[in-house]
């Protein structure tokens, strides 16, 4: 999301490298889910949803409809009066994804979405990611060190090591790629 050290950032073939971050995210409908944070810690879940929706949605009726839809979709009903900093890791992740969807992004960037989550929460998050792609048509770009978790919810993956593309393909192609395996297991990796 920052200005690149070298190269360029292109969205729909337009170079946006020098655009301010807010312009890139709003004009090109990009949502962002950071690894940590992404919400107002001292506000309740409902207050977070209202605060972000007031910034991005002018019409009050549409705003309320959007909030109610996200509360239902991310099962936040029982959490509405709880301050965000008191939520579990999985609950925080659901809240941040809901907040990122308020502006109806076409592209959603997720940074380490599976970090520090339990297996059940990871499975639920994978389901959400697949639904966002297949049902809502949102393009998802995510980075994660847990290849197994990532490969379970994407149709294409790219493995990068030291700034260079090591492997690029479907999850099954990545799993079979020797260079991808060496990236994860080191040069001493041997096929038996």
Task: Please report, for each region that a protein language model flagged, where it lies by residue.
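Conserved ABC ATPase "signature" region
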Residues: 61-79, 127-130
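Catalytic Walker B motif of ABC-type/P-loop ATPase nucleotide-binding domains
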Residues: 108-112
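Conserved catalytic motifs of ABC-family nucleotide-binding domains
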Residues: 104
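Conserved ABC ATPase signature
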Residues: 83-87
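Conserved ABC transporter NBD signature motif
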Residues: 7-18, 25-28
